[in-house]
Each structure stands twice: as C-alpha cells, then as structure tokens.
C-alpha cells in the first residue's frame, strides 16, 4: 500500500459508544501508563542511567502526568462513555503519539514497567489479549513497585466495571508469578530502557500485594 500520511481523522461517537465497554475501557491503560512511565524515567534519572538521547525532561514528564490527572478526573464521563469521557481518552492517546515522535521517538514519558510486564506475559503465555487488561494489571504492579499506588487510582478502578484480573484474561496467578520471576531477565535480554524492572528481584511479597489489590477490586 505504500506510505501515506492521513490528512484528517474522523471520530464517530455513536460507533464508539455502541462497542462493548470492555474495548473502550481498555483505552485507559494506554493513558495510565504515562504515570508509571514517568516514574521509571525518574527512577533512571536518579541513578544516572537515562539514555543520552532521552535525558529526563521535567517539562515533558509534567505534561504527560496532566493527561493522567484529566483521565482520573473524568471517571464518571468515562464510566458512562459519553462524548466528554471518550474525548479524555482520545486526547491523551493523540498527545502520546504526537509527543513520542516529536521528542525524538522518546517513549520514556508514556511507557514503562507496565508494558514490559505485558510484553513478558504475552511472550510466556503465547496468548493475545485485550490490550488494556494486562496493561492495567501491569500498571497496578508498577505503582506497587514504585510504592506509588495512590488512592485515587484505586477509586478510579472501583468505579469502572473493568475486570483485568488474571481470570478475566483466561490466565491464573501462576502465569503472573512466572512473568514476575522472569521480568528482569526479559527486560535485559530485549534491551528495554532502564527502569525499576531492570533491578527487580522477585519475592512473594509483591505478588501477595498485587493479588490483594486485584481481589479487592473484583469484589466491588
């Protein structure tokens, strides 16, 4: 088909609203990941391990976090999947893509440990997923690893009927355990950018914490 640059993108809200909510809710994963991406970037910066081409940029990081704030603030609109809720997700995706290439193909402010977890999970299980489910599970994991699981995120998930437990993805906790045990080596073997996962050493404590949070969200 060759190379083409779209001149415009049209959004049909009615078509989006008619889709199963699990697909639309899935879009939150690729906004929440801005938060854990920035945490990983800050983690690398504090240890002088940022790539020379992707040095920590506080202005870019701050701008990225604003989209997370806006997403969380629009929980009711997202829950109802009205136009304002859809826009809060689309705006973040649009900015994320644009800022990726405009900052020198820098993924630091939009992706980190949450996606690395997902990539390894997909690699080990050889399964395909609704993207937002494993990413949101990885987001909770990343927040726990950074000790930054804020209450606003728990409340956000409580208000959405979006199940991203292993069972909802036809997995079990053994799959998650295996993913965690091999996470560090996966990151290193695939030359993924340095973050908290690069230093991660598996312990049952992190699994217990993750399972506890997911079990609580399932019971809401």
For the regions a language model picked out, list residue spans one by one.
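Active-site segments that bind and position negatively charged phosphate/pyrophosphate groups
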Residues: 54-161
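A glycine/threonine-rich phosphate-anchoring loop and its flanking beta-alpha core
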Residues: 1-63
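C-terminal charged capping/lid subdomain of soluble metabolic enzymes
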Residues: 33, 44, 147-220
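Phosphate-rich cofactor/ligand-interacting catalytic cores and adjacent structured alpha/beta frameworks
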Residues: 34-45, 52-80, 208-220
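Generic structural hydrophobic/aromatic packing signal, biased to beta-strands
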Residues: 9-11, 32, 71, 89, ...
